[in-house]
A protein has these predicted regions:
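Ferredoxin-type iron-sulfur electron-transfer modules in oxidoreductases and energy-metabolism complexes
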Residues: 2-148, 263-273, 308-313, 317, ...
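Iron-sulfur cluster-binding electron-transfer modules in prokaryotic oxidoreductases
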Residues: 3-5, 114-370
Length: 370
């Protein structure tokens, strides 16, 4: 079996273990599936945490990490025929998996069902093609980068017309009663030479697709804080010989979620090339959207992009992670005004999977009254 992702990290799993239960086919991918030791932590509803959201909602053991592992073992052992990745039983097992990465963090065996699902979808698309809905959502970075005005118009048209909304629900499965997120009227963009004095230090701000086109106020607020603290904030831009030098960079998350690995690898290469100055100069790279920034610290390793990925990982920080580090080292010295407002914090599932919510709570604790 030829895989789309690099599963070599699991190469030594199960050596000498007669009870490892590694499926007959699939190589290292099968070993990634077999790490499950059936502890059934994914069937817990009493513990705090993420895993497993589909079970917590349905209370059906069929929608747990363990059940999905069982389905993959059956598929890779030949129980689902010669084309297991197109078998409806495997599709049913994965249908409610939301790729939260909770199992990678909270499962005692660290089953990475998110990555297993990406490979599954890639294998399936290679056989039967990716459906229109998948291609529409996965290519969001392209639509926003190339056709932002057209996309803004199309979303406005769909949100403003009950008829079009119902048609989109029938064709694409997008709930008609829910409005689609609107693109901002003006996207976020830093000056090419950066902004700020740099008396405290220098950082690169990785403005992802969502921070750039949907919620630019978040990127602007982050920039304002960093500049006020004395940092020079530089944009991450494509290299001059990039195939699309005017299109923003992308972490590849939307492609990975939908099993379009080749496209994710393309975006990973673009971003890796653009961040070479940060790697060479050991300059921190700050991200705002957890699923985007953390994909560069995680899935990028599985795409065969070389040793540079590991070096880049050392320079990547979520905004609050960077502030917490700088504060601990005595460099971040901003004081905040009193606040009597109530702040409700909902940690991103990927943020929780990487233990990054601690930094978020720490930074919020600096605000008097919180």
């Amino acid at each position: 079996m030829k895989t789309f992702l690099d599963w070599s990290a699991y190469d030594t799993y199960g050596i000498g273990d007669a009870y490892s239960g590694i499926p007959a086919t699939g190589g290292n991918y099968a070993k990634a599936v077999a790490v499950c030791m059936h502890s059934r932590d994914c069937q817990s509803t009493s513990k705090r945490g993420v895993m497993c959201p589909s079970f917590r909602i349905t209370n059906d053991p069929a929608h747990t990490t363990e059940a999905r592992v069982a389905a993959f073992k059956a598929a890779l052992n030949g129980e689902y025929g010669e084309s297991p990745f197109t078998d409806p039983r495997l599709a049913a097992a994965m249908d409610l998996c939301v790729s939260c990465k909770g199992c990678k963090k909270e499962c005692p065996s660290a089953v990475d069902m998110t990555l297993i699902k990406t490979e599954f979808l890639a294998q399936k698309h290679a056989l039967v093609g990716a459906p229109l809905r998948t291609r529409l959502f996965a290519n969001l970075p392209l639509w926003t980068g190339r056709y932002a005005k057209l996309l803004r118009f199309a979303i406005g048209l769909r949100n403003g017309s009950t008829l079009i909304a119902r048609l989109a629900e029938k064709v694409l499965g997008i709930a008609a009663q829910k409005p689609l997120p609107r693109l901002a009227t003006s996207s976020f963009q830093l000056p090419i030479d950066g902004i700020g004095t740099g008396e405290t230090g220098e950082v690169f701000l990785f403005a992802d697709t969502f921070s750039t086109h949907f919620d630019p106020q978040i990127a602007r607020a982050a920039t304002e804080i960093l500049v006020a603290a004395g940092y020079k904030v530089r944009p991450v831009v494509p290299v001059p010989d990039d195939a699309e030098p005017t299109r923003g960079l992308c972490c590849g998350r939307t492609y990975l979620t939908h099993g379009m690995v080749d496209e994710a690898r393309r975006e990973g290469k673009r971003t890796l090339a653009a961040l070479k100055p940060a790697v060479d100069g050991k300059i921190p790279v700050i991200g705002l959207e957890p699923s985007c920034l953390l994909s560069l610290r995680d899935e990028l390793y599985c795409m065969g992009l070389g040793a540079e990925v590991g070096e880049l990982g050392k320079q990547l920080f979520l905004f609050e992670e960077f502030l917490a580090r700088e504060h601990a080292q005595g460099r971040f010295k901003l004081s905040f005004k009193d606040s009597t407002s109530t702040v409700l914090v909902h940690g991103h599932c990927h943020q929780k999977a990487f233990g990054a919510t601690k930094a978020l709570r720490k930074v919020l604790s600096w605000i008097p009254g919180q």
